């Protein structure tokens, strides 16, 4: 019986050793699986956080773009209103007392640009003022001219139009940034 007992003890020891070894391997497998799961979880969390941050950046960028678009629209609207006010003023400037001086300068500049001028065309409402300002050149009515003159040469084939509204049109693009800046202040 002692041999049986000895064999049984030895078998029991071997079983315990195998069980312990299996438990150790199982614990290692579980630990490795937990580590891989944690690594995967951390990786997914980083990915989600990066996606969240990217979404926030996109949302901020979209909001900034929308804000800038609104500012630009407001600025353009303000510039348009300023130009409309100036055009309204220029439309009424012909009735101002100082308009004779303005028309005189417009005529002089036109004559300098076209030295061989045959005629000066002005709006019919400005004929009397223009006749007093011009000598040596025919003064004609031209209803399409408003707030200025058209100096004509070579039978009307060449000439220059010098009006206040024309001058405004020429400087609009250059003045828009300055007007926008002033409106923003």
Swiss-Prot record:
The keyword Ion transport applies. One of its GO terms (molecular function) is proton-transporting ATP synthase activity, rotational mechanism. The keyword Ion transport applies. InterPro entries: ATPase_E_C (IPR038495), ATPase_V1_Esu (IPR002842). GO terms for biological process: proton motive force-driven plasma membrane ATP synthesis. Keywords: ATP synthesis, Hydrogen ion transport, Ion transport, Transport. Transmembrane segments: none annotated. Signal peptide: none annotated. One of its GO terms (cellular component) is proton-transporting two-sector ATPase complex, catalytic domain. Belongs to the V-ATPase E subunit family. Produces ATP from ADP in the presence of a proton gradient across the membrane. This is V-type ATP synthase subunit E. The lineage of its organism: Bacteria, Thermotogati, Deinococcota, Deinococci, Deinococcales. The gene is atpE.
